[in-house]
Amino acid sequence: MYRIIAADLDGTLLSPENKITKYTEKIIKFLIEKGFYFVFASGRHYIDIMKIRDTLNIKVFMITSNGAQVYDLNNVLIFENHLDEEIALKLCKMKYLDADIITQVYRNNQWYINNNKIDNNFCPTLSSLRYKYFCPDVFNFKKVSKVFFTSHNLKKLHTLQKDIISFLGNRVNVHFSVPGCLEVVSGEVSKGYGLKLISNILGISLKECITFGDGMNDQDMLSISGKACIMENADSSLKKNLPYAEVIGSNKNDGVAVFLNKNFIKNNKFIKCF
């Protein structure tokens, strides 16, 4: 039986409106009451994930910034690993002046965006943080958890991904969370590493973990768990890379909650009442 439930947020647990629906909320709370451990695993900043958790008034583990930080049930930081300062600087200079690509940084509790851009349609609606402008020549690159690039020009982002891998190799992990967002963290961290850490702390085997995701940054987490579930709306490359994973409903239709209800709490009177 699975005891740890780990889920990505955007495109997975969250609705297309970037909310936890009432139905999903009730399923999560019911399972936590029954002794299951929940893990929110996301590329989002810690502050964003914390606010989602606090809105639900629950205790969950949190894997933030694609594994750069991991928090326990009591909101204690139990792991962090930042990008090397030199690497973060190089990343931020790669496309800083490209008019089609927005360079963005998570450092400590702040979100930064390159100062030659005004239109940033990708992130303000997804985040409770408000960005500040930065210039890499005078920026302090200590404790940068993630550098990410957003663009409507997907061809440029795919070329950038190849360039980063060629230039930095395994010193970084670089993945698309969604087609228009390329994310880079330290090569020593990932959602999968965060899940391993949590399973070790709890003394629960990874075989007793079930995972849910939709993006390429979810692949390593999905690949190490006892059961992997991919959203109907997931990246086609993810489905191709993990052919054994079960494809479930879309986030538009509460896919995760519907699956959990059917497979974990079927015929329970509490669930039947809503």
Curated annotation (Swiss-Prot):
<feature type="binding site">
    <location>
        <begin position="42"/>
        <end position="43"/>
    </location>
    <ligand>
        <name>phosphate</name>
    </ligand>
</feature>
<protein>
    <recommendedName>
        <fullName>Putative phosphatase BUsg_029</fullName>
        <ecNumber>3.1.3.-</ecNumber>
    </recommendedName>
</protein>
<dbReference type="InterPro" id="IPR023214">
    <property type="entry name" value="HAD_sf"/>
</dbReference>
<keyword id="KW-0479">Metal-binding</keyword>
<feature type="binding site">
    <location>
        <position position="8"/>
    </location>
    <ligand>
        <name>Mg(2+)</name>
    </ligand>
</feature>
<feature type="binding site">
    <location>
        <position position="191"/>
    </location>
    <ligand>
        <name>phosphate</name>
    </ligand>
</feature>
<feature type="binding site">
    <location>
        <position position="9"/>
    </location>
    <ligand>
        <name>phosphate</name>
    </ligand>
</feature>
<dbReference type="InterPro" id="IPR006379">
    <property type="entry name" value="HAD-SF_hydro_IIB"/>
</dbReference>
<keyword id="KW-0378">Hydrolase</keyword>
<comment type="similarity">
    <text>Belongs to the HAD-like hydrolase superfamily. Cof family.</text>
</comment>
<dbReference type="InterPro" id="IPR036412">
    <property type="entry name" value="HAD-like_sf"/>
</dbReference>
<feature type="binding site">
    <location>
        <position position="10"/>
    </location>
    <ligand>
        <name>Mg(2+)</name>
    </ligand>
</feature>
<feature type="active site" description="Nucleophile">
    <location>
        <position position="8"/>
    </location>
</feature>
<feature type="binding site">
    <location>
        <position position="217"/>
    </location>
    <ligand>
        <name>phosphate</name>
    </ligand>
</feature>
<dbReference type="Pfam" id="PF08282">
    <property type="entry name" value="Hydrolase_3"/>
</dbReference>
<feature type="binding site">
    <location>
        <position position="214"/>
    </location>
    <ligand>
        <name>Mg(2+)</name>
    </ligand>
</feature>
<dbReference type="GO" id="GO:0016791">
    <property type="term" value="F:phosphatase activity"/>
</dbReference>
<dbReference type="GO" id="GO:0000287">
    <property type="term" value="F:magnesium ion binding"/>
</dbReference>
<keyword id="KW-0460">Magnesium</keyword>
<dbReference type="InterPro" id="IPR000150">
    <property type="entry name" value="Cof"/>
</dbReference>
